[in-house]
Structures are given as C-alpha cells and as structure tokens.
C-alpha cells in the first residue's frame, strides 16, 4: 500500500503544473495587506516525526526565517485579539515507502497557508473564522537519509515566497516619483 502511495506522490509531483502549487498572485496579495503580523502554527504527522522532522524544530526554523525576512510574528494571544485572526499554518506530511522499489524512499508535502477571518460581501452577517487567503505547497520524494534536508529546503523556499508576498503587500510605494 505504501509503495503505491509513494508512486502516487511521484506522479503528482510530475503532473501538477507549477502554478497550481502556489497561490501568490497580485490579485490575492491584497489579503496580506495590513494584517499586522501572523501567528505561526506548525503540524507534522507521525511519519515526518519518525524521520527526524519534528514540529518543534520546524516551528523554530520557520520563525527564524520569517523574522530574518522582517515578517511580524504574533503570539497566540496577539493573534486572537487581532480582528483578522491571522495565522500562518505550516503542515508537513510524509509517507514512508515500504517493499520493493519504494523501500527507503519518503514522499512528502510542505503546505504553507495564511488563514484569517473573512466576511461574505453578499451578506455581511456571514463570516468565516478560517478562510485560506494565500497558500503555497511543495511536494517531493527523498531517500530516508536525505528527507530532513529536502523538507527543510522546500520549507525555506516556501516561507521565503510567503515573506516576499507579505513584505510587498505591506510596503508603501513611493508616490513622490523618487524625489
């Protein structure tokens, strides 16, 4: 069964167009504008933990990357007091290959998404506490000895993509014509 899941993950990597793996477009960056920061929450499933990719390490690495990129980080309390409830959710999932041909391989996905409170324009009485307004996903396959490095690299690239979008959405443009 795991052999088929690994094969499916490889096929998914090959067949998914690059623009489907991320939703970072000019038209949706405005949803990051004025958030005032994000609370970072990480999730890693048991197979990821078993190959050395722990939720705690991912949380620390993610926060370091975001701070270095000058993205404001919120505590959980600050996030709950913010009307947007801005959360950057990082989810890592792994499938460990078993049997002929898949033994020693690990298929993985790294998902980074911004969730925030949203209100329906057609009826302001309807609000959603967790609407995904920005996301990016990376998928890959690595040998069990290299999965931690591969996952960390994909996470870094994905977080840098978010940081760029966030900073650009929250940087005021100079309207003075450079004077």
Predicted regions and their residues:
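Positively charged n-region of N-terminal signal peptides that target proteins for export
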Residues: 1-5
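A structural detector for beta-sheet-dominated domains
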Residues: 33, 41-45, 74, 91-95, ...
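N-terminal, post-signal-peptide region of Sec/Tat-exported proteins
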Residues: 51-82
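A structural "domain/chain start" motif
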Residues: 18-60, 168-179
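Bacterial N-terminal signal peptides
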Residues: 6-16
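C-terminal/domain-edge helix-coil "capping" segments
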Residues: 23-30, 121-179
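Surface-exposed short loop/turn segments
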Residues: 69, 79-133, 141, 145
